[in-house]
Amino acid sequence: MFYGHHHSYSEKPDADKEAIDDLTRQAKDQTGVMATLTRARVEQLKAEIQAERAFSKGLDRSQKQILKTINAALEISSPSALLNLSPPEFSSLLLNGGLGEAIDGYIDQQNRIMKSIDKVMNATAPEFSMNSIEAQSAAIQTQNVSAIFDDLIVPEISAAVKAGLTDIMLFVPVEVAMSNMATKMKSSRGGQLNAIKTKISQYGRSLTAVAAEAADLDNYLFTGPRDGITRKFCRALVDLVVDEKQMSKLDNGQGLSVKTSCGGYNCRHSWSPVSEGFIRAANLQKAKPKNIAKANAGAR
């Protein structure tokens, strides 16, 4: 989703709670369509945070299962034979050995996020249905799974397993090699989960962007926490509406798309597609050139 706090995964989870509490307070102070939208955003943020935490637990279980799988494989095969497996065969070993379960669990979390986005769209465009972008949603879901597992998780786990198998082949005791394997997997977790947190947020934002295009909405309300730990880029935009032309001029300074990454890595703010009717009903303010310039000046 598109929220704008910017903490690393290793920081205390209170940062997520602060973002939820901030938005919840906003919803209580609001009325009508704006309150409905903010409540929907709270649900989406909760769904994304739940996805992050469930992913962490699922990956932990999968890595432990992979270690058991490799241990069992070594009882009937040699480390050199396992190292000689083709890339597809080696990936299959990891998937069937525990990683597949983590993928299935993440897809379940993706579906929860999609349902929360449906509520967001219902708040701003009641006539729109996510069913109308089923094909695009499936493509985004597949791409997101690939970006997380194929690009981040599988290479790290493969490297750790192959390093351990090489150690065993060089006569390092199996117990020592397996322990080193587990340590290597664990050491990569921090960076992985931080990147994954951003990928999960980008998934929700990408779905919303496609939904907005399908619903012919080209105005976006920037919503999210208003507290003091919010990026200057985000603080300059909170509660303002930008159009597509203004969106293209925004630069978060991190080389990431503003539409799908907002303020950048780990951002907890969001873009909500809104119609002209919604803008009038909620008495929203449209961003001016000075607001865009101020946001860009605060980017980092």
Predicted regions: what they are:
Residues 185-287:
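Acidic, glycine-rich two-metal-ion catalytic cores of nucleic acid-processing enzymes
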Residues 1-193, 199, 203, 274-300:
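N-terminal leader/targeting and assembly helices and adjacent pre-domain segments
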